[in-house]
Swiss-Prot record:
Organism phylogeny: Bacteria, Bacillati, Bacillota, Bacilli, Lactobacillales
Segments for region (Disordered): 14-41
Cellular component, GO annotation: cytoplasm
Organism listed in the record: Lactobacillus johnsonii (strain CNCM I-12250 / La1 / NCC 533)
Gene: sepF
Pfam family, one: SepF
Bias type Acidic residues, positions: 14-31
Keywords recorded for this protein, A-Z: Cell cycle, Cell division, Cytoplasm, Septation
Protein name stated in the entry: Cell division protein SepF
InterPro entries, A to Z: Cell_div_SepF, Cell_div_SepF/SepF-rel, SepF-like_sf
Cellular compartments annotated: Cytoplasm
Any one Gene Ontology BP term: division septum assembly
Family per record: Belongs to the SepF family.
Highest taxon, organism lineage: Bacteria
Keyword Heme: no
Biological role: Cell division protein that is part of the divisome complex and is recruited early to the Z-ring. Probably stimulates Z-ring formation, perhaps through the cross-linking of FtsZ protofilaments. Its function overlaps with FtsA.
Amino acid sequence: MAFDKLGRFFGISEDDEMNEVPYTESEEQQEEIPQTQKNERRANVVSINSGVSATSKIVLYEPRVYSDAKEVAQNLLNNKAVIINFARMDDEQARRIVDFITGTVYALNGEIQRVGDKIFLATPPKFETDGKIAELVEKKDKMD
């Protein structure tokens, strides 16, 4: 009798054991929710930018004064490669512009290469250049 009161206090009694419903596996199978529809919808998502092909531009410059370096740097900032011909400038001014452009290219993680006697190629970060023209120029200079 004392055990019955104690059992009821904790929720354990002989009456409760009689009221339990046996578990069947058929109930579990009915509760499953199909998830294949969600996965099929996600497979149809396509990035908008994946079909668009970007065009790359190369800008040619023949600077005559130091202030022209700003335009060259602006094109590099706009992800355009720049070929600079210093044939019509004195060497001191050309060195100043090359120093300025080299700083710009360094800040952008780009590259600058000498491709001729007074010709440089400056490229922004995502441009690839292949080959070396400098070797051909050196061979030509040795032949002359």
